[in-house]
Amino acid sequence: MTKAIIRLENLEKTYRVGETEVHALRGVTYEVHEGEFVAIMGPSGSGKSTLMNIIGCLDRPTSGRYFLEGEEVSTFDRDKLAHIRNRKIGFVFQTFNLLSRTTALENVELPLLYSNVSSKVMTELAKKALASVGLGDRIHHKTNQLSGGEQQR
């Protein structure tokens, strides 16, 4: 069996809304192994976004443990979490979250600003990424000049 890339142990997340406690996650235990594709599905309000925010290091669990590649993420400081978001975890969102006044190239370069690479390397990497999804000839197009499918890529 392949190793667990993501391991969640008894994750809980509780939000306080005024006087009310909202239990978004209760006792989630799960593993995602190398090479697996996973879909998180459920009705509205079932905790999908909360779970994804924790896995994506955008939020912390109230209790429980989260391991990424064997390291306990729940204890990391902000800088280490930012590094994980920049280098290890990525999401495909339902909405594109692109900056409308920038080009496809600039949108792809944006996350690389946090990676401490030169602007030349940043541009080369962004061009390579765009070419790999069939958008090499669209790098200078603004987001509103791209089709929905092109924006998603």
Where are these regions (language model features)?
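ABC family nucleotide-binding domain
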Residues: 3-153
